[in-house]
Amino acid sequence: GCIGCGACAKLGRCAFDGVVNEFAEKLGEADGFVFGSPVHYAAASGNMTAFMDRLFYSAPKEAFCRKPAAVITSARRAGTTAAYEQLLKYPGITEMPIVSSCYWNNVHGSRAEDIQQDEEGVRIMRVLGHNMAWLLRCIEAGKAAGVPEPRKEPLARTNFIR
């Protein structure tokens, strides 16, 4: 995971080479994102948490800003909503419109075949896909119609301890 070394501020990428930097190089090509994780101990997997921490800390915030994001979690039984809330924090702090569905974006099952039996979960995923596609079309239509993006607010930092 991210060790908070700050090297990314100087390098423009994570100091540790690998999948995070490979993914970050492709951010500009994406119109939106779907991030998903299995649930381990009522949280997103350690691998996904480490990936998201490093990606969102080291990549330029402009690469995420105003690009729609959805998060999905999958578990055998429980913990999906806690993991879902955990993953929502990343797009929530980078000005990404969060795409929702008709329920929390969770499916249940240990294997892909099991998930297909989760009729409600599969429906939630279909609605999520439709909503993501619709929002992407709305953004494109807004750009074509000349609707300006919101102006960038100047950075303001506050420490809680003074």
Q: What positions do the PLM features span?
A:
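Cysteine-cluster motifs in flexible loop/terminal segments that predominantly coordinate metals
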Residues: 1-27, 156-162
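Helix-loop-strand module that forms the ligand-binding subsite of alpha/beta enzymes
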Residues: 13-105
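A short alpha-helix capping/helix-coil boundary motif
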Residues: 2-4, 65-68, 143
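Glycine-rich phosphate/pyrophosphate-binding loop and the adjoining helix
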Residues: 97-162
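Short secondary-structure transition/capping segments
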Residues: 1-4, 47-48, 110-114
